[in-house]
Amino acid sequence: MQSIQIPTGIHCANNLPFVLFGGINVLESEDLALRSCAEYVRVTDKLGIPYVFKASFDKANRSSIHSYRGPGLDEGMRIFEKVKQEFGVPIITDVHEPWQAAIVAQTADILQLPAFLARQTDLVIALAKTGKVINIKKPQFLSPSQMAHIAEKFREAGNDQLILCDRGSCFGYDNLVVDMLGFDVMTKSTGGLPVIFDVTHALQQRDPGGAASGGRRQQSAQLARSAMALGLAGLFLEAHPDPAKALCDGPSALPLAQLEPYLAQIKAIDDLVKSFDPLHID
């Protein structure tokens, strides 16, 4: 198993205690970012869970041109700096264009390659050249084994500090399912890279013809428990103080007030699964 080191001494690997990549979908305001991060830090400190704060500064792939995208690059980096100063946590955020990579890398500790852009070679090279840890979102339209080709692009560009993230696979039109066998396929096909699970976006459910995604947050705990029972390197999760008022993906977001009991269950499962001796079946 390959272990990836994240600033502040966090190690991310499939056989180590899981890392939480948690936060809000998009930066709505400085106040919301700070309040949300404060609760994440309180809960993860209490439960002993390594933690990375996540949010987007620009949701560049919204279905409607009228949908909220975020504060933009400059204001987004300012808010991230404030979060880091206040809480001392690592930051993960997504990059959509090659020219953004070097700028975002000055603030963020982990750069995320969005699922819809995962095969864009120029973006891959720009991200690789930053030398930062990279979180690669698996496109909904790719098989798990195809992630090996994306990982190889990064390695050829000089960066092997990679994490793989599954966020579900297309199942017909406007629906996603999670292939539980695919996590192991991704790890083995990439030489043991850490694999994490984005439970929030796996819960998305499109309204045919609608301009915004629906979601199934009522099934979030069941899906997260199932995936984390496989022994994964981390969980990618979004929570919001009031999901009904969230400016993006509220229907898939966990109510922030339920974060502690939710993560307590995930940690119990992770601790149990990783206490087992490896079982190799021929």
UniProtKB/Swiss-Prot annotation:
HAMAP family per the UniProt record, alphabetical: KDO8P_synth (MF_00056)
Gene this protein is translated from: kdsA
Pfam families: DAHP_synth_1
Entries under InterPro entries matching the protein: Aldolase_TIM, DAHP1/KDSA, KDO8P_synthase
Domain of life: Bacteria
Key word Transferase present: yes
Organism this protein belongs to: Bordetella avium (strain 197N)
EC numbers, comma separated: 2.5.1.55
Key word Transferase present: yes
Molecular function terms from GO: 3-deoxy-8-phosphooctulonate synthase activity
Pathway linked to the protein: Carbohydrate biosynthesis; 3-deoxy-D-manno-octulosonate biosynthesis; 3-deoxy-D-manno-octulosonate from D-ribulose 5-phosphate: step 2/3; Bacterial outer membrane biogenesis; lipopolysaccharide biosynthesis
Compartment(s) of residence: Cytoplasm
Descriptive protein name: 2-dehydro-3-deoxyphosphooctonate aldolase
Alphabetic keyword roster: Cytoplasm, Lipopolysaccharide biosynthesis, Transferase
One GO-annotated biological process of the protein: keto-3-deoxy-D-manno-octulosonic acid biosynthetic process
Lineage start: Bacteria, Pseudomonadati, Pseudomonadota, Betaproteobacteria, Burkholderiales
Reaction it catalyzes: D-arabinose 5-phosphate + phosphoenolpyruvate + H2O = 3-deoxy-alpha-D-manno-2-octulosonate-8-phosphate + phosphate
Similarity comment text for this entry: Belongs to the KdsA family.
Gene3D superfamilies associated with the record: Aldolase class I (3.20.20.70)
Main location: cytoplasm
GO-annotated cellular components: cytoplasm
First-tier enzyme category under EC: transferase
